[in-house]
Curated annotation (Swiss-Prot):
The keyword Iron does not apply. Negative regulator of class I heat shock genes (grpE-dnaK-dnaJ and groELS operons). Prevents heat-shock induction of these operons. PANTHER family: HEAT-INDUCIBLE TRANSCRIPTION REPRESSOR HRCA. This is Heat-inducible transcription repressor HrcA. One of its GO terms (molecular function) is DNA binding. It comes from Staphylococcus aureus (strain MRSA252). Pfam families: HrcA (PF01628). GO terms for biological process: negative regulation of DNA-templated transcription.
Amino acid sequence: MITDRQLSILNAIVEDYVDFGQPVGSKTLIERHNLNVSPATIRNEMKQLEDLNYIEKTHSSSGRSPSQLGFRYYVNRLLEQTSHQKTNKLRRLNQLLVENQYDVSSALTYFADELSNISQYTTLVVHPNHKQDIINNVHLIRANPNLVIMVIVFSSGHVEHVHLASDIPFSNDKLNTISNFVTNKLTEFNQNLQDDIVSFVQSEQEEIFINKLLNTMNNHISNQSNSIYMGGKVKLIDALNESNVSSIQPILQYIESNRIAELLQDISSPNINVKIGNEIDDSLSDISIVTSQYHFDETLKGQIAVIGPTAMHYQNVIQLLNRIW
C-alpha cells in the first residue's frame, strides 16, 4: 500500500510519461504539477516508489518511468473510480446499424473505424454471436445467372447477406417458393428435415440447391460469430515505431491470430477490463489491451478491444468504452 502523496506522484509520473513519452524527473514534476512539497521530498518519495517496483530508472536518463506494476496500480485506481460513475450511454452503434440498413458487418466495420479515430488507437470489434439469435426469414434474390443472394433476417431485426453460387437458373417464383419452405422449416432442423426436403422438391437439382443453401447459411453464421473487424491498424504500428521496432512483428502476429480472438471471446463480464504487457502474453511487454462489451440490444452483444502501447491514455479509453452501448 502506498501513501496518498506517493499515489499523487505516481499518477503524475504515469500521466507525464504517457503525454510526453520521456522518463520523468523530480524537477519536471515540480514544474508541471502542484504537489506542494520540496524537491528533496519528491526525490525521496520517488526512491520509495522505485523500491516498491512502481517506477524504474532507465540507463540513459536521470528520470523515472512507470513499470508494468506501476501502470497496473494506476489503472486499477481508474477502474475503481469509473465503476461508480453513471454515464450517458452513446447509441452510436444502433445509429450505424440503421444507416447501414441493419447490415451488422457493415455497421461494425464503421464502428471499429470510428472508435479508432476517437481513441487514436487500434480497435478490434468482434461480431456478435448470432447462434443465440433466432432466424425469422430467409429471402433469396437472383443477382445474375450464377449468383443468388441469401438475405437472412433475425428476430432482433439484424440482417446478414450471403452469396450463394448456383449453376441452376431458378426463376424468381421458384426462389420465392424455396425461401418460404426454408423459412417455415427453420424451427424444425432435426432428423426429419431431409425427408421434408425430399417431399418438397420437384427435382434433384432443387434438393442439391436447398442442402447447399442450408449448409452455407449454417457455416456463415458460425464463421461470422468469430469475425473481427479492425480499425486503425497503422496507429499501433506508428506508436510502436516510436518505442521499439523489434516488438512490432510479434504483436501484429498476435492480434491477427486466433489468440486475440480467444482472448476477446473469453470476456463474459460486461465490465471494462485492462490487460497490460505480459498479462496478455509473455512476448507482449509493450502493449496494453482494454476490453469491454457492446450491445445491439439486451440479448445480442459482442466484444470491443482498444490496443495501444503500455503508455496508453487509459483514462480517455476507459471513459470512452464506459459510454458505449
